[in-house]
Amino acid sequence: SSAFLKARPEIRTACYVAITADRGLCGGYNSGILRATEGEVKADVLASKDYLVVPVGRKAENYFRFRSYKTSRSFTGFSDAPKYEDAKAIGQFVVDLYLRGEVDRVELVYTRFVSSGRQEVVRRPLVPLERDVIAGGDGKSASGGNYEFEPDPELILQTLLPRYVEARIYAALLNAAASEHAFRQRAMKSATDNAEELIKNLSRIMNRARQDSITTEIMEIVSGAEALGSDDKDDVVREMASN
């Protein structure tokens, strides 16, 4: 059977592929992935197990390296528009780590896009692959049927399973990119709404200050006019008295 399907008897080193964005200004998108990955790493450390983080995105790269976590090669520069070649490069790298025995399990940590208003951080096993059992009507596994393979089934597995790993990584990258755009759209809308509210408040304050200034000037003019009028009356009275 393929090495992709064989679970290791003991998980000594776990590998986490943390998919974040290359840029910020997207609300809590990056922090959710970083917290989830860091939580798994700390749990491994408490269990006396080793770990390795594969950062995807500059935010993950900067976060884990700045805090001196064990990291491997990082993959950056494509978070907003990933291509299949990007997933292929990541897949080949982590599969090579697994086949060489440097890690015993590989997991994806990314943000799953549910809808434009809902995204969730998920952790999905990548290698070894999990087998799905199709249940029959009697509660037992359904019959697989008789199939003829050309070429040999082992050769087909060895060819298709790495492609399957790449496809799953690509799906995770697409989910992450859609989630990043949704988070950024909400963050920018919130910033715009806050800016408009701030403009209204500042305009109200400015108008009030301008009104107070105009009122003060009018009061000064009226007071000055009244003072001048009072002086003129005094002059007339003195002139009449002298006559």
Model-derived segments and their meaning:
Residues 1-243:
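C-terminal beta-strand-loop-alpha-helix "lid" module of Rossmann-like NAD(P)-dependent dehydrogenases
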